[in-house]
Curated annotation (Swiss-Prot):
One of its GO terms (molecular function) is ditrans,polycis-undecaprenyl-diphosphate synthase [(2E,6E)-farnesyl-diphosphate specific] activity. This is Ditrans,polycis-undecaprenyl-diphosphate synthase ((2E,6E)-farnesyl-diphosphate specific). The keyword Transferase applies. Substrate binds at residues 22-26, 34, 38, 66-68, 70, 72, 189, 195-197.
């Protein structure tokens, strides 16, 4: 499967990005530790992967751990790291068996060496899978993403490999996370919070946004189908007029 030749279905997103929000609050409302919510959140993530495989959605990007999440209580951060290692031990083999390609975006250098090794092994194991590309944003921030891309171009200019006037949106975008994938068609955030929280700031310029009050641990196929039904009813303009969209055809979505 060539990523840039994935057929466009105007009623079904090729690429969904999700902020999995509400694990801690879901647990606290039940007088349980926040870590209980994170465990339930992993199950919700797996349900979402199952749904995407069933529907033929080709790309799913999940915001698992932001660059700002390092400021949370140390015990919660440590739990998330330990849970991640255990997940890679059990879950990756199952994802591989089902044809899921696993990727990670974000700043890995802050993670424990053992966890980074698990990430690398997961990527290598699943690299040739094509049913679904699952990108996990870990220690990721949208501003950080843009800054690193700008820094890379600045280094090329300083080294004489690039002229400043050669820099344009396309070139900057090539240095961003998910550069080889089409931008997300749909962005979903759970828990009733209506903001994008520094997630994929560059990549979601023309993405359809959808918010739900459902907490992430309770997110399921019924809620996700509601999101897809809403998406199918929308007309994506990309800055064009109705007449221009009609002349190009509704399925003409920029890559």
């Amino acid at each position: 499967m060539q990523i840039n030749t994935i057929p466009v279905n105007p009623t079904l997103p090729r690429h969904i990005a999700i902020i999995m929000d509400g694990n801690g609050r879901w647990a606290e409302r039940r007088s349980r530790p926040r870590t209980t919510g994170h465990r339930a959140g992993v199950k919700a993530a797996m349900r979402t992967v199952d749904f995407c495989l069933e529907k033929g959605i080709k790309m799913l990007t999940l915001f698992a751990f932001s660059s700002e999440n390092w400021n949370r209580p140390a015990d919660e951060v440590n739990f998330l790291m330990e849970m991640s290692i255990k997940l890679f031990g059990r879950g990756i083999e199952e994802l591989h068996r089902r044809g899921v390609q696993v990727r990670f975006i974000g700043e890995r250098k802050r993670f424990d060496i053992a966890l980074v090794e698990h990430m690398t092994k997961a990527e290598h194991l699943t690299a040739n899978n094509q049913r679904l590309i699952l990108s996990l944003a870990v220690s990721y921030g949208g501003r950080q993403d843009i800054t690193m891309a700008a820094r890379a171009l600045a280094q090329d200019v300083a080294a004489g490999r690039l002229k400043p006037e050669q820099i344009d949106e396309d070139l900057l975008g090539q240095h961003m996370a998910l550069a080889d994938l089409p931008p997300p068609d749909m962005f979903i955030r759970t828990s009733g919070v209506i903001r994008i929280s520094n997630f994929l700031l560059w990549q979601i310029a023309y993405t359809e946004l959808w918010f739900t009050d459902v907490m992430w641990p309770e997110f399921n196929s019924t809620v996700l189908q509601q999101a897809l039904d809403d998406y199918a009813s929308r007309e994506r303009r990309f800055g064009l007029t109705n007449a221009q969209i009609a002349s190009r055809g509704k399925g003409s979505i920029p890559a």
